[in-house]
């Protein structure tokens, strides 16, 4: 297998960042990829919350738009048709300040909107509709 210099090939259990230390590892990365064909998972907001420029698979099939991320503002949307183009754009201009701005805005959005406090508030509001 050909290894690329800008990709970390270390498995999670082969370094000190395991279990609850994993977010500290994510914070060391400039970018990350989250892809799930059928439904978004915790990696979507976990990576964004760590401040990574997050390439997210958001499609009609996985219904990921409900998370509230905005393509080009809080993350980069990818799908099976555009991911190579999106990665190439980033890798060919990796020092462009727009990537850091998107990562920072994505982190702020995630910490503000996808947290336990907000989830409990939303759940209480939903429950009061049915009581």
Task: Give a label for each model feature.
Residues 1-8:
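Short helix-loop-beta junction
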Residues 10-16, 20-131:
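Catalytic binding pocket for nucleotide-activated donors in carbohydrate/polymer assembly enzymes
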